[in-house]
Amino acid sequence: MNTQTIDATIQRFNAIRWHDSKLVGLCFYRAEGEERVKISLEMLGEGGALTPAEMIFEASTYVALDVDLEGKRVCSDDISSAECYASSEWTKSLSEKSPYDSFEGYLHFRLYLIPPGGTINVLAKDFSLEMGAPG
């Protein structure tokens, strides 16, 4: 993945309107020879309408979850924000623990739930967002 593609992916992810959208599901699966992480969402649109959506993290290699399910429920499954990074403390930590694994071309996708909901971290090469998908 070249720098231009990485930058475009980061910008595309960070441009999504995350605040007060809802995290309603999480799934791990394998397709086309790669690991994938799917999150089912209800994306908040103009006028407060919620639209079902699915986000697929493609070519995923690591996931770290710190989710308080009761806190998530109490806060109506709301997402606070989300960000994508080319490099982060988490990716540096993974590299130190696994010096023989190459994480070149991987991006750190992080979703923050409304406190005390927690965080979801995914190390993947790309993502796709399908609006109107069943949740």
Language-model regions: role of each:
Residues M1-G135:
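Surface-exposed, interaction-prone regions used to assemble/regulate multi-protein complexes
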